[in-house]
Curated annotation (Swiss-Prot):
Domain of life, source organism: Bacteria
Keywords: Cell inner membrane, Cell membrane, Lipoprotein, Membrane, Palmitate, Signal, Transport
Mutagenesis or variant effect for N194D: In strain: PLi
Lipidation (N-palmitoyl cysteine): C18
Name listed for the protein in its UniProt record: Basic membrane protein A2
Classification via PANTHER family: ABC TRANSPORTER GUANOSINE-BINDING PROTEIN NUPN (PTHR34296:SF2), TRANSCRIPTIONAL ACTIVATOR PROTEIN MED (PTHR34296)
Organism phylogeny: Bacteria, Pseudomonadati, Spirochaetota, Spirochaetia, Spirochaetales
InterPro entries xref list: BMP_lipoprotein (IPR050957), Peripla_BP_I (IPR028082), PnrA-like (IPR003760)
Family the UniProt entry places it in: Belongs to the BMP lipoprotein family.
């Protein structure tokens, strides 16, 4: 009898160890998405939300959405783990360190992060990162800005200075200089992605200095800039970011530098659910060639001839005839070539 009980106990232990979180073998898969701040930012986080909603429409999954902040990342991720998540998406570079930490602590769970900032050290095999050549789309919008500016002064409004936002900034500035070497460009950072009022304040000052086009990469701060452009009216323009933001101010938004976070999330998650395979331990990089970054066509503000020029530039970037800079060092090198 004792031997029989031991055998049953042993089989139970084996069963429990094989049916841990992360497996898709039984039950409805649970996919979680955690963001810094709010999903309703009209750009980056919202794009991720739209992407995962499309996955839910196609697959039978349980979806958990979590809005978080720096001080609660670990506890919120612990909660998603305890809830039985198979796959957890972390949206934004601010999760870079914590993504590695939790993936090492929980090898049975799959993790995926958008916009990680990693150097050469190994990535855990249950973690995958999505990175973007955002500078390529921004190069095109910078070219447009320089071509349509009436004052010869354009600007860039960033959230927090760093690798991710710098790609937009220096791509934009390079595209503008490619179009017009004499264009004047002013860049400002508000130190936050969640401060609408700071975006309003800085944008107001930029417009008063004679800048007529502002490219933002500031999330909710950019919403503040859009509000200012809309209030000031004709002659005050914005270039949106991540998604097509023209609906927010149709008469003021010339175009948007798109970075389709939602599409990349959708592609990877759908493949994971279809195949039950997870190829982690790596970074996946998207750009113009993959159709994930680009710009929004707007015949109302972008003349047909200019659009043709942009299409030609896109081909040159895809064919690597133009290598778009992504930081200060590569930008300065670009200007010398």
């Amino acid at each position: 009898m004792n031997k029989l009980l031991l055998l049953i106990l042993f089989e139970c232990i084996i069963f429990l160890s094989c049916s841990g979180k992360g497996s898709l073998e039984s039950g409805i898969p649970k996919v979680s998405v955690i963001v810094n701040g709010t999903f309703d930012d009209k750009s980056f986080n919202e794009s991720a939300l739209n992407g995962i909603k499309k996955v839910k429409e196609e697959f039978k999954i349980e979806l958990v959405l979590k809005e978080s902040s720096t001080n609660s990342y670990l506890s919120d991720l612990e909660g998603l783990k305890d809830a039985g998540s198979n796959l957890i998406w972390l949206i934004g570079y601010r999760f870079s360190d914590v993504a590695k930490a939790v993936s090492l602590q929980n090898p049975e769970i799959k993790y995926a992060i958008i916009d990680p900032v990693y150097s050469e050290e190994p990535i855990p095999t249950n973690l995958v990162g999505m990175t973007f050549r955002a500078q390529e789309g921004a190069f095109l919008t910078g070219y447009i800005a320089a071509k349509v500016s009436k004052t010869g002064k354009i600007g860039f409004l960033g959230g927090i200075e760093g690798e991710i936002v710098d790609a937009f900034r220096y791509g934009y500035e390079a595209g503008a200089k490619y179009a017009n070497k004499d264009i004047k460009i002013s860049a400002h950072y508000i130190g936050s992605f969640n401060d609408v009022e700071a975006g309003r304040s800085v944008a107001t000052k930029m417009y008063s200095d004679g800048i007529d086009i502002i490219h933002h990469a500031a999330s909710l701060g950019g919403i503040g800039a859009i509000e200012v452009a809309k209030e000031l009216g004709s002659g005050h323009y914005i270039i949106g970011v991540d998604e097509d933001q023209s609906y927010l101010a149709p008469n003021n938004i010339i175009t948007s530098a798109t970075k389709d976070v939602g599409r990349s999330l959708n592609i990877f998650t759908s493949n994971y659910l279809k195949t039950n395979t997870f190829e982690g331990g790596r970074l996946i990089n998207y750009g113009l060639k993959e159709g994930v970054v680009g710009f929004v066509k707007n015949p109302k503000m972008i003349p047909f001839e200019l659009e043709k020029e942009i299409d030609n530039l896109s081909s040159k970037i895809i064919n690597q005839e133009i290598i778009v800079p992504y930081n200060k060092e590569s930008y300065e090198k670009f200007l010398k070539e």
